[in-house]
């Protein structure tokens, strides 16, 4: 097995709540500008320990999420050693096969890879995501009648059977990237946090 990683995924985007991409439908307005961050709680790639690190992408999705042709900027946690950075980028680029190769097939163009300080401080849909000077998002979950966070199960992005994805919104979401031609500054749009397990 080339890799095994388990942790939390966070997606913030320009779609309204709830982002249609999570059930395979077209994004609101026909396109979607999004940040997807993967924080690895525990994991290794080719025997390189990558626990505690985060890899994120800023993406422009030109249509239905499953049709691909995404334009992508990759951000690697600045705390990663050169060996850890290489391991993470190899896995998430699909070069090591498995489910991450399926994910990487959605990429049409990778415009660059950058090291950046990444803050991933989110629990049950509430918290903060910051990626250098490129992304800053505050996150709030929706709550059900019992006061517990509203959740989704078995979405197209689910990799752990039965694991919840917490439905929320971003009171503030800012994302700028000249390589992607993105300049977003919006309020109260989609934010979803879930769990992932990748083995390949």
Spell out what each predicted region is:
Residues 70, 74-152, 158:
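Charged linear interaction tracts used for macromolecular binding and regulation
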Residues 21, 57-59, 116-121:
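Short amphipathic beta-strand and strand-loop transition segments with alternating hydrophobic
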Residues 2-45:
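N-terminal ordered "arm"
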Residues 18-20, 41-45, 60, 77-79, ...:
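Generic structural motif
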Residues 47-54, 74, 108-114, 156-158, ...:
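Low-complexity, flexible helical/coil segments
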Residues 6, 29, 65, 120-122:
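Sterically constrained small-residue positions within well-ordered secondary structures
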Residues 142-200:
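Extended, charged low-complexity segments
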Residues 32-101:
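Aromatic- and glycine-enriched beta-alpha-beta binding-site module
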């Amino acid at each position: 097995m080339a890799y095994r990683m388990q942790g939390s995924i966070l997606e913030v985007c320009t779609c309204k709540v709830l982002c249609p991409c999570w059930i395979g439908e077209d994004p609101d307005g026909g396109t979607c500008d999004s940040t997807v961050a993967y924080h690895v709680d525990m994991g290794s790639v080719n025997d390189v320990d990558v626990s505690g690190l985060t890899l994120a992408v800023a993406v422009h999705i030109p249509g239905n999420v499953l049709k691909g042709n995404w334009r992508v900027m990759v951000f690697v946690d600045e705390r990663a050693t050169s060996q850890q950075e290489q391991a993470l980028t190899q896995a998430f680029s699909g070069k090591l096969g498995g489910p991450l190769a399926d994910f990487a097939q959605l990429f049409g163009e990778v415009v660059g890879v950058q090291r950046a300080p990444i803050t991933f401080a989110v629990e049950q849909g509430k918290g903060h995501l910051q990626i250098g000077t490129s992304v800053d998002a505050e996150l709030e979950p929706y709550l059900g009648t019992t006061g517990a966070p509203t959740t989704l199960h078995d979405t197209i992005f689910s990799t752990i059977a039965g694991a919840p994805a917490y439905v929320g919104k971003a009171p503030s979401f800012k994302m700028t990237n000249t390589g992607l031609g993105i300049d977003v500054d919006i309020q109260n749009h989609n934010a979803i946090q879930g769990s992932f397990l990748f083995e390949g």
